[in-house]
Amino acid sequence: VEPIKKGLDQVLKGASVVLFALLVVIVVWQVFTRQVLNSPSAWTEELARYTFVWVGLFATALVFSERGHIAVDFVVDKFSPRVQKVVAVCVQLSIILFALAVLVYGGLRAANGAWNQSLSALPTQVGVMYLAMPIVGVLIAFYAVYHLQAVLRGAEEAIAHEEDPQVV
């Protein structure tokens, strides 16, 4: 499972970098055509919006991969290691449920419902753009299962702590 996770991490990192670079180019082109040419490009705003959404969702999956999401753990830190493990299992199960129910199922329904709707400025359907949700839902569910099994077998701490905490 570890090689699959590392491979997915690399693909997500690469896709995020490419999409972010594309987003920068799109926005620069949009500003250039609007301010310099006085003829704003019709497609840039729509493409920038959807590119931003895809970058944000892919980055969310990467954060789940690294267990870097926000966690309020000051209460859980007070519990015994056994209770911390139970809480961690419940959290990962909740993440799996949310990812599958909302992102995968809901995302597929949204994509299916919008499949015949065309974007106004781009030659594609809205449903294609909505496919980011189920894709990211599957990735988040995979990462949650990965962390769940790692916590259960003791390979990861029940609560993810910063490796190098910064005290301000």
Language-model-detected regions and their locations in the chain:
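Alpha-helical transmembrane segments and membrane-interface helix-loop junctions
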Residues: V1-V168
